[in-house]
Amino acid sequence: MKQPFIIAGLLCMLLIGTLSGCVGPVATETLTKTYAATDATVMTVSNLNGQVDITGWNGDTIVLTTVKRSSVGQADLKNINISVTTSGGHFDVKTIYTGSSMTQPSVDLTLKVPYNVTIDTVSNSNGAIHLTSTKGDTVLSTSNGAILVDHVNGYVSAATSNAYVEIKGTTGIDGAHTSNGAISVEVQSLRDDITIGTSNAAVTVYLNPSLNATVDAATSNARVTVEGITLNTSLLQETHVIGTLGTADHRIEIRTSNGNVYLYNL
């Protein structure tokens, strides 16, 4: 009676192996290249699966290190192309995969960029983004990966899902969004109305007391805490606070559900 079950099990294993592409030891390939840059260089980065790490440095070149990984063998690494194009002052990095849609290779991109290079956009399909000591009004987007920003000479907006967002040491922010992940941001200055939002997690916002803005902070099933900063409040409830810093030139809307909101002095 055991034979039919053995045959069925072997057939299931064969089917799984066919669908997954014969998963085996992870093949890797690491490559470092150096590129020229000027103070007028504007950079964009677009990746698939993996981490993107961009750090400013005092050199005069862009150093790009790529780490390719594939679970279906060394041959699949040839299907991963890191496209670098330079035209009209733009420096664009893009990961392109031409292999089977049944596999999910990954690429880690690590870039050292001169401090005066402007970082325009950084996008990633699945993975973290780290941005440190750079310049530019930068738009960051990914999913299933944290976004960590530290010391950027410019305004930053960040959007991800199922992961943490942290923005500190920037000129200002244009917004921060995630789901099922906490947010911690410093708001040094504003150039427009912004929203900061997540779900099922806490939001911590450090506010420059010199801001001119209306702060509207609310949560569904937790509480809003204001500490160390004075708001001219028009609404003061456990789950919803509306107050003004200076004049109401801009609006900061903060939202979460099933998580606390903390407003602190920067």
Predicted features and spans:
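All-beta strand scaffolds that present successive hydrophobic residues in beta-strands
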Residues: M43, I119-V122, I173, D193-I196
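Extended beta-sheet lipid-handling architectures
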Residues: N47, T121-N124, L131-S133, T142, ...
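Beta-strand repeat scaffolds of extracellular/surface proteins
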Residues: Q51, W57-G59, N116, T134-D137, ...
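Short, surface-exposed interaction patches in beta-rich subdomains
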Residues: D174-T178, A182-L266
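Positively charged n-region of N-terminal signal peptides that target proteins for export
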Residues: M1-F5, L11
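Short coil-to-beta strand junction motifs in C2/discoidin
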Residues: D76-K78, S210
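Short acidic/polar N-terminal linker immediately downstream of export determinants
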Residues: I7-G9, G17-I62, V67-A75, G99-S106, ...
